[in-house]
Amino acid sequence: YHGYDIDTNKRITISTWQSLYKLDRKFFKDYGAVIGDEAHLFKAVSLTKIMTKLTDCKYRIGLTGTLDDSKTHKLVLQGLFGMVNKVVSTAELIDRKQLAQLKVVCLNLKYNEIESKKVKDVKYFEELEYITSSNPRNKYIRNLALALKGNTLLLFQLVEKHGEILFKLIKEKANQKRKVFFVFGGTDTDDREQIRAITEREENAIIVASYGTFSTGINIRNLHNIVFSSPTKSPIRVLQSIGRGLRLSLIHISEPTRQSL
């Protein structure tokens, strides 16, 4: 990754895709196998470039827990890695007690008629900006995050217009001893790892994080609640985000009461 020499005499190279996709074809000529983690991301142009440069690579393995329903996405991945082989489902792993029990709760917030008419005919992004700037809605999310027992991951989409606001609201009302973290694209990688490690040792921490930083690839074994504070239309993002909460935890957590919100 950044800061390390790409030339090596080792048999195995572990790298971020950002460090590789601009390299010439000759760099890849000696590799006979490639393993792509989070393979659902390989439809991106940069990752596709890497795979197409591996012309002499005989063994191609892609690993993912989520594929979207679009035929195009599936065909792109088949072209890069080969036919899809489903090894096991999430439901099976839950039944085997290798993943945590999952409960999805849909909280339907009602708006009055005047407020509803304001966004009746607007486009998606305008509606997104409207609901994320709603003070009553944000306070409800704050109260929800504070009422939930256990470690909570609260995901947002817009950093300045939503994430920073939620973090401030939660931080102001949280008990001084309760740890509240804010993570977005500008957060240093080492700081993110430190936050992850601290949360694994806590019992009631709150992480306010952007989808881009904490919805995929982050492994927190002691995470009990995930709150989607911003809507998202991506099935993969939803499933990957839920996956953050499927790691097993030894701590039993009770649910918040309606009165606590």
Residue ranges and their predicted role:
Residues 40-103:
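Post-DEXD/H (motif II) to motif III coupling segment of the RecA-like Helicase ATP-binding lobe
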Residues 218-231:
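A short beta-strand element within the Helicase C-terminal
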Residues 234-249:
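Conserved SF2 helicase motif VI
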Residues 157-184:
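Conserved helicase motor "Helicase C" RecA-like lobe of SF1/SF2 P-loop NTPases
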Residues 251-261:
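Single conserved hydrophobic/aromatic residue that forms the stacking wall/gate
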Residues 122-154, 165-168:
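Conserved interdomain hinge at the start of the Helicase C-terminal
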Residues 4-33, 44-49:
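Conserved helix/coil segment N-terminal to the catalytic DExD/H
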Residues 5-8, 180-211:
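Conserved helicase ATPase core of P-loop NTP-dependent helicases/translocases
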